[in-house]
Amino acid sequence: MQYTSGSTRNPAGVMITNEALVTDVLQINEALRFEAPMRIPTWLPQHHDMGVIVAILGVVLGQVLEIMSPRDFLQNPKRWVDKLSRRGDDPADVHIYTCIPNFALDLAARYAAPETPDQYDFSAVDCIIIGSESVTKPGVEAFVGAFGDSGLDRTVLRPSYGLAETTLLVSTDRTEDRPKFVEFDREALAQGKAVPAEDGVPMASNGQPVKWMHFAIVDTETKNELPEGEIGEIWVNGNNVAAGYLDRPEETEATFRNTIGTTLQDGLPKDNWCATGDLGTVLDDHLYITGRVKDLVVVAGRNHYPQDIEATAMEASDHVRKDSVAAFAVPGDDVERLIILAERADDATEEGDAAAEDAIRSAITTNHGISPEVVEFRAPGGVARSTAGKIARRVNAKQFTEREHAAAE
């Protein structure tokens, strides 16, 4: 039994079969091509799918994992960074593998950057899988900037996509130019198209689907497969897909028992597709994740991706703590209202809220053509997150709405 992270709803128990578990581990092994001797340092929580699969991989590969708790990492990111560095007792041909969410890149760069280039030796790092949340260009650049002179090869960073419903991995970048970022036209994105453009919205490639499964981008209304460059829901079909949700028959039917319509690929099965709830597109054999179906901010009939708005808010002011913004919509009298919740940076005070709010409003209006009804600042840790550390937009929206209703009574 593997529970979802709870970033979009209450955690659901996902029933992982032995077949799904073995299939996923084989898919990961084939995609990453592990080489011995190796070390696998990890701080991922063992109750989260990434942490569980890393632990099982250690068993399958016959490796002893170097485990620390998430608290150990968060209190001092250097503890994890130290383990990525080549040690005196490492074999000359050692390979180091690890797996992290995106926010760890910035934390490591900020709090564990070397004082001198020779403080670390990252030459043995073979792969850093980045998943669980959207991979951001600033996070990648900060990490490479901090550790590039210490022997870090940029191509070891591998943005990847997966979810509990498929046991874990769905895609990872296996090209030589990873990590790959493409900027997409914001207006086209709002219309369901992915069109590369200068000064657009940067998105990370999550690579190519793993072997031994079927994969399609599907129109959420017609259920037909969409061509390259069009945005739709990501559907997956294969032995890595879970059996369903525990004691949730209706949700199981809606998520795991889907029938695809017209297809463009040859040989696709008709039934038992898993609708992931994630929106994305494929362009030049690269998968790009654009958002969640249920997280879309729809104002005046236009689609806006919350992570895009959140990125704008973070870049608008140094008053905002990195990766600590929630953008969501709540019902209004005529149209939905855009709400922004942001945590203050560690060194920020309430006195700077007003100026930062003005900067955020101006940036969002300029870049997205909408104006937030509420911009609210909170202390660090004040924005709700899932058990995996991801911003829980729907939880924040529910709490915000409940608070408004309570205040009105």
Residue ranges of model-derived segments:
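Conserved AMP-binding/adenylation subdomain of ANL enzymes
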Residues: 22-39, 46-96, 111-114
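Motif- and composition-driven signal specific to adenylation
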Residues: 15-19, 30, 36-38, 42-44, ...
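Conserved ATP-binding/catalytic segment of the ANL
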Residues: 204-214, 220-229, 233-299
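Hydrophobic alpha-helical scaffolding
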Residues: 14, 18, 44-45, 70-73, ...
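Conserved C-terminal "lid"/linker of ANL adenylate-forming enzymes
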Residues: 323-328, 339-340, 361-409
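Conserved AMP-binding A3 loop
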Residues: 1-23
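AMP-binding/adenylate-forming catalytic core of the ANL superfamily
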Residues: 85, 238, 243-244, 254, ...
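Gly/Ser/Thr-rich phosphate-binding loop
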Residues: 92-98, 109-200, 214, 222-223
